[in-house]
Amino acid sequence: MEEENPILRSPAIPDWVLFTDESIVVVNKPAGLRSVSDGYDPSLPHLRSVLEPVLGRLWMVHRLDKETSGLIVLARDADSHRELNRQFREREPIKHYLAQVAPQPQWNEITLEAPLKVNADRAHRTRVDFEYGKPARTDFLVLRREDSWAEVDCTLHSGVTHQIRAHLYHLGLGILGDPLYQPPQFKAAQKSEVERMMLHASELTFTHPKTGALMHFQA
């Protein structure tokens, strides 16, 4: 049995740090915490500002929206950062998200391959744009259905900003708690008790940058 990493037993480490070794840190980022420093107010908390006082210097590899919770891997040295950047640039990691959406999808499974343009309107939303958009593909699978909403597994095959939210919007769906991407039929279907955007990065699979081992995390 593998011995528990003593670093994770430190009371100074947030309980949402799931794994760390000499090369990487894997976290289950809480909703509301920024992945990177805010461009207007750098003093606002973000992943590195919270973790670096305890774990030392960290390198960002990828990010989640502030409102999105879930799995992120960070590098602990420049070589690991370089290798993880290569993996993400070449779309090698497998990323699954869980989204609670409304209204009910008219399908159980669908793949949307539609190019996306970032900052496409005055609200700075990402929109499907077949002329100027970047290639983007998302697989959607309905996992369960409730009265007015459904839980959907979303698998990314590209990495455009707001990709899941924009692709769902193009399909006439919105994520519960998302104030930015709301199709006309969406508001009446929202759960009244939702206080955050119901999008969570639930699975992450990648290759360890030093050992070559396959790393798989669920949260």
Task: Give a label for each model feature.
Residues 1-219:
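RNA pseudouridine synthases
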